[in-house]
Structures are given as C-alpha cells and as structure tokens.
Amino acid sequence: MKAGRYRIARDMTNNDIINSLRSQNLAVTVAFNNQHSLGLLAQRISNQVEADSLSLMGVFTDSLFLSLNSFSKESALAMYLPNSYEFFWNTSAKKIRSKLQKAYNIFWTSNRKQKAKAMGLTPVEVSILAAIVQEESKEFTEQPRI
C-alpha cells in the first residue's frame, strides 16, 4: 500500500478495498486563483496535497531554480498561473513545482511573448498586470476598461 488518496464506498467488500488500495490512487484537483504571495500559494496548495507549505516554499524560492528560469524571488509568483491542476495526493513539492513551471512554459508561446513585447511588457509584467486587473474588478465586463 502506498500513501495517496483512495475512495472507499460503503458497499465495497474487503477484497474490493484491498484492490483499491493496491492500484487506485486517485488524483486530487488542486485549484488556486490569484494569490498575493508565494507563502499564500504554498499554503493553498498544501491544504490539498501531502506536501507541506514549508517544503513548497523551499522549492518555490530555490535560488538555483529561479536563476535557471530567469526569475527572482520577487517575480517568482508570476510563474504559477492560476488554474486547476491534477496531482496525486503524495506528489512531491519538486514535482508540483515542475508541473506548474511546465504549464507556464506551455502558456507563454512565442506568439504570446511577441504580443507582450509589442505592448512593451515582459511575461512577468503581463502576469502582474492581469493579477491587478482581476483584483480590482471581479466583474468580467469591466476588466478591459481597467
């Protein structure tokens, strides 16, 4: 048996439960919107998976990782795009970070980077601006004006 998330129903037999524990580790949907800090993001994610907020903060602020990906501790929050992600409950903090980084890299296509550059912005600045706009108005129709 491995650590994880499992579903056990009332009508399951002992054999069904054992088979479930052996082979049916369920994915957890981890969702977050704009967070105001890496600490709040780590706390939000740690409430939904086994990894604790300290281990998440450790990998989120790892200076080697940040420098290899052209981020600083101040801009690192922009790498973690608000969305829903699926993880197994016992996914390590490093694997969580890797999946979130991969989503960031997939999102920022060369076309999107060119559009940002045409507006005189970097991808990090676009993320910051988007977070401000979303925070200032929860009314979707008002957001383009802001």
Predicted ranges, named:
Residues 1-146:
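Conserved catalytic or metal-liganding residues and their short signature motifs at active sites
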